[in-house]
A protein has these predicted regions:
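Structural and coupling elements of P-loop NTPases
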Residues: 1-350
Length: 350
């Protein structure tokens, strides 16, 4: 949960591995995500696997924010990475911040939207920050990159273009954020921010921008599927009053699923009873009575289910778009010799 402007938001986070061997895990996650925070190293910039994962995100048209991490490391260069995201990934990457210092002198950022400096406090390990004037030696650079930001936003929203040419500083924070959000949802602009997750610097401002710019499940017009018998196209809207539809792990796209209820697996044609539902937090399982449109949860009770299966209300069957995976380079199965070893193997693998 994250508190932002007196509102409490529930954020379902799926952390995907960055190594090439686990590209399939990224693909599985992108299929059910509404928005994405794409991590880059401030030292290494855009890497080959970054390009692969970016293309996967493009395939699913997932709106995204770029977070340039490791600003405290030797060789960190935020603007170099922003340039690489533009040139190598072909995106309209726009800096929303400029770092105050770099490497061992990285202390904060300049917020280009609000024209303010932010310094994270060392005494509480970055849990809080202090607003400060923009350093004098950065004023010229800040003015240049703020104008680039406002020009990009005004270029997307024609209603702001005239106002931008008359007086760029007349654009309000809300006007900038609203236009920027629309551009992000349209995948026309990729906002770029920076920080050091190890030192807890920049994470808070990044999460605030997630609330402002990335889509809520309720922003979706709905998910398209097909009727398993007739092949007719169906649209399921993110509404708890719609018939239930989900993909197993599970991501709910419409309706509401109660523990103890039955769902139809449209691949197998079997009905499955959902005995229990959990909200996952790392390796902790918190029992919950139901999930509804937009939620992600884990369920117990399946007898026959595969990744990409569609689960739905038996009275309103639908097949959602599944997932396509590349053939594995090598196949290997691990299984316990005895039932007693099953729990031990689970602990070892986790």
């Amino acid at each position: 949960f994250w508190n932002y402007r007196n509102n409490k938001y529930q954020v379902n986070v799926i952390d995907t591995p960055g190594h090439v061997d686990f590209t399939v895990e990224v693909n599985r996650s992108l299929r059910v995500l509404d928005g994405l925070v794409f991590l880059f190293s401030a030292v290494d910039g855009v890497e080959p696997q970054s390009e692969t994962n970016w293309r996967l995100a493009d395939n699913y048209a997932v709106p995204r924010i770029g977070f340039v991490n490791k600003m405290d490391r030797s060789g960190a260069d935020f603007l170099k990475v922003v340039g690489q995201v533009k040139s190598m990934l072909g995106s309209e990457a726009v800096a929303l911040q400029l770092p105050i210092g770099a490497e061992d002198t990285f202390t904060g950022v300049v917020d280009l939207i609000n024209n303010r400096g932010i310094i994270w406090n060392e005494h509480d390990k970055g849990m809080t920050f202090t607003e400060v004037p923009i350093p004098e030696d950065m004023l010229e650079e800040v003015a240049e990159y703020r104008e680039r930001l406002l020009e990009a936003v005004a270029g997307y929203d024609e209603s702001l273009m005239e106002k931008f040419f008359e007086d760029p500083n007349s654009l309000t924070e809300r006007e900038i954020l609203n236009a920027l959000r629309a551009a992000v949802l349209d995948n026309s602009i990729v906002p770029m921010v920076c920080g050091s997750s190890f030192k807890n610097k920049g994470v808070q401002t990044m999460l605030d921008l997630v609330m402002e710019l990335l889509p809520s499940p309720m922003d979706s017009e709905g998910v398209k599927g097909t009727h398993p018998d007739t092949g007719a196209e169906l649209l399921r809207k993110p509404d708890v009053n719609e018939p239930f539809a989900a993909l197993g792990f599970i991501r709910a796209y419409s309706g509401k699923l109660d523990a103890g209820s039955y769902v139809l697996n449209t691949r197998s044609g079997n009905k499955e009873r959902i005995s229990r539902i959990f909200q996952m937090h790392a390796n902790k399982q918190n029992p919950i009575p139901f999930i509804e449109a937009g939620d992600i949860g884990a369920v117990v009770g399946f007898k026959d289910i595969k990744t990409g299966d569609t689960l739905c209300d038996p009275k309103h069957p639908v097949i959602l778009e599944s997932m396509e995976f590349a053939d594995p380079v090598i196949q290997l199965a691990i299984e316990p010799k005895t039932k007693a070893g099953q729990e031990k193997m689970g602990i070892a693998l986790s």
